[in-house]
């Protein structure tokens, strides 16, 4: 499916049909509809109106972008979009709609919105609208004349941004003030003609990124220092630096010219010497020496001018660094406004106290319930070592502990039958006096039986 982006990516030049939407050559019925004129009012058939406008409006703008132009005329568009000898009959309506939406603007209206008085200084590329255009507007006729120049607003903004970046990346950006002629040479590839170049400058001026001034009959342009900064008016310092830069260029050209003259005198002396014309050779050498002295004097002046410019550039850098330091100090003061050493120490103490409390809580939760008994791990380790040492010794020959025997015998045997249990119970009931037999429970063993009196 065709889109303005695809058409914009197509290379400029060549067969126009190859740069246009697919239906341009494939769908005769649709192209006949698109080449027909618009109805007098959109309300008559809004679907057909919107379909045509949706096709032609993006195509007009993308065609201009692909061609690298910001200025367009109805006549040029009709020639560009000819198809089999026919021209689109609705292009004037399309341009009127783009004007209404603000995507296009009359060149004269754009100039009136910006201070363009400097353009009249010997630059006769912009003229007032012809009288018939003015009368047609006064009478309410909104038709676009075939020769009237319109400006694509968005394309002009893109071109202005391109020129600004081109300047920023060039050696001319070493100082914000530059000669208009030098800037025009720099932008020769970006701006196809002089009128486009001046429109771009007007757009940059409208965005407050450049200002134009005439100095000694020559126009100079001052740029803003940063991409988001606003340009300041041209002051005496800017003019002085510009004059120094012009002097540097003039001296450099003069030195180059004198160097070529000195070399020419040297060649003349060599030829005269070969021809045996000694006096002529001496005169040529004297002229060479005089030229070299002039070159030395010009070099001294050039060094002085360059030294002054270097100091100015260094001072500008120092000013930028100073401003950065000043901004940094202000930011630090603002960020440290409520911070003091006492507050910092108090905050650290609170953090330490909270950390200690957290450690105590963690230890308490990790210890669990101990029934009030605290065990010393070191003492337990010592006792365990003693027990391990005792196991290596021979056991003592001691009598059996009756309590152990009684306790062992008192444990019921799960294998005893019911008859055995009854016999055991009978023994318990008949036993009187003395200690309970060894087969009785440990509790009864510890209770002596009293004899009757």
UniProtKB/Swiss-Prot annotation:
Region (Disordered): 1-22, 392-453
InterPro entries the UniProt entry points to: Snf7_fam (IPR005024)
Cellular component GO terms, alphabetical: amphisome membrane; cytoplasmic side of plasma membrane; ESCRT III complex; kinetochore; kinetochore microtubule; lysosomal membrane; midbody; multivesicular body membrane
One Pfam family here: Snf7
Residue ranges that the Swiss-Prot or TrEMBL entry lists as coiled coil: 243-312
Gene Ontology annotations of biological process type: autophagosome maturation; exit from mitosis; late endosome to lysosome transport; late endosome to vacuole transport; late endosome to vacuole transport via multivesicular body sorting pathway; midbody abscission; mitotic metaphase chromosome alignment; nuclear membrane reassembly
Biased composition, class Low complexity, residue ranges: 10-22
Similarity remark: Belongs to the SNF7 family.
Subunit record text: Interacts with CHMP4B, but not with VPS25. Interacts with LEMD2 (via C-terminus).
Gene3D superfamilies for the chain: 6.10.250.1710, ESAT-6-like
Keyword set includes RNA-binding: no
Subcellular location: Cytoplasm; Nucleus envelope
UniProt modified residues of type Phosphoserine: 232, 410, 417, 431, 441
Protein name: Charged multivesicular body protein 7
Ranges of compositional bias, category Basic and acidic residues: 392-407
Function: ESCRT-III-like protein required to recruit the ESCRT-III complex to the nuclear envelope (NE) during late anaphase. Together with SPAST, the ESCRT-III complex promotes NE sealing and mitotic spindle disassembly during late anaphase. Recruited to the reforming NE during anaphase by LEMD2. Plays a role in the endosomal sorting pathway.
Modified residues (Phosphothreonine): 408
Predominant location category: cytoplasm
């Amino acid at each position: 499916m065709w889109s303005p982006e695809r058409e914009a990516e197509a290379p400029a030049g060549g067969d126009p049909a190859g740069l246009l939407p697919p239906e341009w050559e494939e769908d005769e019925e649709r192209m006949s509809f698109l080449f027909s004129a618009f109805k007098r009012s959109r309300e008559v058939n809004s679907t057909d109106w919107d379909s045509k406008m949706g096709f032609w409006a993006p195509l007009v703008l993308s065609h201009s972008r692909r061609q690298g132009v910001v200025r367009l005329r109805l006549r040029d568009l009709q020639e560009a979009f000819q198809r089999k000898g026919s021209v689109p009959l609705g292009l004037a309506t399309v341009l009127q709609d783009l004007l209404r939406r603000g995507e296009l603007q009359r060149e004269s209206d754009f100039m009136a919105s910006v201070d363009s008085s400097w353009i009249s200084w010997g630059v006769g590329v912009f003229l007032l609208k012809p009288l018939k255009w003015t009368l047609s507007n006064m009478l309410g006729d909104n038709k676009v004349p075939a020769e009237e120049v319109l400006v694509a607003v968005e394309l002009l903004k893109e071109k202005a941004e391109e020129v600004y970046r081109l300047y920023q990346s060039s050696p001319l950006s070493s100082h914000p003030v530059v000669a208009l002629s030098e800037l025009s040479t720099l932008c020769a590839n970006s701006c196809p003609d002089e009128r486009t170049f001046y429109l771009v400058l007007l757009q940059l001026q409208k965005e407050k990124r450049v200002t134009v001034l005439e100095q000694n009959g020559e126009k100079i342009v001052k740029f803003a220092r940063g991409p988001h900064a606003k340009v300041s008016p041209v002051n005496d310092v800017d003019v002085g630096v510009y004059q120094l830069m012009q002097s540097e260029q003039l001296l450099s050209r003069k030195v180059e010219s004198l160097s070529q003259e000195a070399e020419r005198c040297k060649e003349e002396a060599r030829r005269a010497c070969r021809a045996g014309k000694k006096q002529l050779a001496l005169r040529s050498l004297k002229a060479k020496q005089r030229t070299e002295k002039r070159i030395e004097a010009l070099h001294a002046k050039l060094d002085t001018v360059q030294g002054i410019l270097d100091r100015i550039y260094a001072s500008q850098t120092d000013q930028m660094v100073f401003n950065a330091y000043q901004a940094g100090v202000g930011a630090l003061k603002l960020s440290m406004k409520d911070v003091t050493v006492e507050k910092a120490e108090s905050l650290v103490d609170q953090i330490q106290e909270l950390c200690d409390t957290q450690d105590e809580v963690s230890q308490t939760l990790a210890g669990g319930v101990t029934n009030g008994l605290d065990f010393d791990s070191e003492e337990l380790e010592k006792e365990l070592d003693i027990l391990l040492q005792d196991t290596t010794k021979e056991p003592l020959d001691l009598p059996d502990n009756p309590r152990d025997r009684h306790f062992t015998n008192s444990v019921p045997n799960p294998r005893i039958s019911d008859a055995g249990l009854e016999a055991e119970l009978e023994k318990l009931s008949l036993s009187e006096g003395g200690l309970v037999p060894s087969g009785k429970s440990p509790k009864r063993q510890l209770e002596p039986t009293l004899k009757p009196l």
